[in-house]
């Protein structure tokens, strides 16, 4: 090897160090955000010394941080020693930008970063790490996420920022105009619901979330005196009576929960969903086989550290939806980080009498999580039987991304699953 040329060993070592130092890169970004450096630079070219004087900080530390930001492409250095924001920072890191991601990044810098410091413990235990990260034992992960009003607002603002970038895309992946009543389940600040109301003015839209979240949304996220474009309804979607709707939106909800809780929730939604209705699921879907993409794998680890669930493959979401009575699922990638899945309502899961015959099929009984006993699980399950479900590939963007479970043929048996035993007769029009 010629002197000065990088060999394979050197390249591998450079890659290794890049991976090992990744946390330092994140902390440079997080510290600059926390100190407000990008907001200061948004006012015009600014010298590191002036920034240090404004904040009362170490001149040397400020200079080092701003130089690191420059090398990372977050700031631009001028020949006179001043700094300005890069285009990326002006778009995503300045407080007043319509596309700012500042609050989401600050949430990652705090609660999320703290949980990731205990990744090895999370892998050993297979559970969230709030007790180590923030000193709260969290059987219900949202009691830790919403552990104080400032934390609740930071999390809600972070999600609002996410939907400012991605909301329109996932809401137009399918034409939702035929759904007259739309409910955004776990809709937080109402950002996604308000975008739905704007895109589909003929529909009535509501947000359903926990009482403290709804109170915060009304206080901090609605313009004073303005008539809101959506309704806000308070409740617990595992315990409370759910509003009736033609379409339920679950945006980044199912990945919070294990399979039993997902089927429990989806079963409750089946009973609240009107005939001909559907679910719109928004998730970072894993590729077939679950080996990627990397972002979804990292998010799945994050769900282990911060919640009870994980990211899933499209077939996993199809199976969960089918068990709860939403047997036809379409998947689309509208651009951006998330997939959109439309799962259409079928007959109620449980005992179904075949049309034109006296044959019956027995559905399964899945209770999921007992909410009255923290941390308790129920393994009770009945039996499932029946035939007649067929699969056909859905061609999207040139490849088969998922299969669609079609309606059973007349006279066939269908096994379903819900969070309690149900029975009914399969009638014409149930399969929409």
Swiss-Prot record:
Transmembrane segments: none
Coiled coil regions in record: none
Protein's UniProt keywords contain DNA damage: no
Induction remark: Exhibits very slight night/day variation, if any.
Binding residues for S-adenosyl-L-methionine: 146, 163, 209, 235-237, 252
Top-level taxon: Eukaryota
UniProt keyword annotation of S-adenosyl-L-methionine present: yes
SUPFAM superfamilies: S-adenosyl-L-methionine-dependent methyltransferases, Winged helix' DNA-binding domain
Job of this protein: Catalyzes the transfer of a methyl group onto N-acetylserotonin, producing melatonin (N-acetyl-5-methoxytryptamine).
Protein name: Acetylserotonin O-methyltransferase
Organism: Rattus norvegicus
């Amino acid at each position: 090897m010629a002197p000065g040329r990088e060999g394979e060993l050197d390249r591998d070592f450079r890659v290794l160090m890049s991976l090992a130092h990744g946390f330092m890169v994140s902390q440079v970004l997080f510290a600059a955000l926390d100190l407000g450096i990008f907001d200061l630079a948004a006012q015009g070219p600014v010298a590191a010394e002036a920034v240090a004087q404004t904040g009362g900080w170490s001149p040397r530390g400020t200079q080092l941080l701003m130089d690191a930001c420059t090398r990372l492409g977050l700031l631009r250095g001028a020949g006179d020693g001043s700094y300005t924001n890069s285009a990326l920072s002006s778009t995503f890191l300045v407080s007043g930008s319509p596309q700012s991601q500042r609050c989401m990044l600050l949430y990652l810098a705090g609660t999320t970063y703290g949980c990731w410091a205990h990744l090895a413990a999370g892998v050993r235990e297979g559970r969230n790490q709030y007790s180590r990260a923030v000193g709260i034992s969290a059987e219900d992960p949202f009691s830790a996420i919403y552990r104080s009003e400032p934390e609740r607002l930071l999390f809600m603002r972070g999600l609002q920022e996410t939907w400012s970038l991605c909301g329109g895309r996932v809401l137009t992946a399918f034409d939702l105009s035929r759904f007259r009543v739309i409910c955004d389940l776990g809709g937080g600040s109402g950002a996604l619901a308000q975008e739905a109301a704007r895109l589909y003015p003929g529909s009535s839209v509501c947000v359903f979330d926990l009482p403290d979240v709804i109170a915060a949304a009304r206080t901090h996220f609605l313009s004073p005196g303005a008539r809101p474009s959506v309704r806000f309804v308070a409740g617990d979607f595992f315990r409370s009576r759910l509003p009736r709707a033609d379409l339920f939106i679950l945006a980044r909800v199912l990945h919070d929960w294990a399979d039993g809780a997902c089927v429990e929730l989806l079963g409750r939604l089946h009973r609240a969903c009107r005939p001909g209705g559907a679910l719109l699921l928004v998730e970072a879907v894993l590729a077939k086989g679950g080996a990627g993409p990397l972002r979804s794998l990292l998010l799945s680890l994050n769900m282990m550290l911060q919640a009870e669930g994980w990211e899933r493959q499209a077939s996993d979401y199809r199976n969960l939806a089918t068990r709860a009575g939403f047997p036809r699922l379409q998947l689309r990638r509208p651009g951006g980080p998330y997939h959109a899945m439309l799962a259409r309502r079928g007959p109620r899961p449980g005992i179904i009498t075949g049309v034109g015959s006296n044959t019956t099929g027995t559905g399964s009984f899945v209770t999921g999580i007992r909410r009255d006993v923290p941390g308790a699980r129920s393994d009770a399950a009945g039996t499932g039987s029946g035939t007649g479900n067929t699969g056909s590939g859905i061609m999207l963007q040139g490849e088969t991304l998922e299969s669609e479970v079609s309606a059973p043929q007349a006279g066939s048996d269908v096994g379903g699953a819900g969070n309690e035993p149900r029975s009914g007769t399969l009638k014409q029009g149930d399969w929409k």
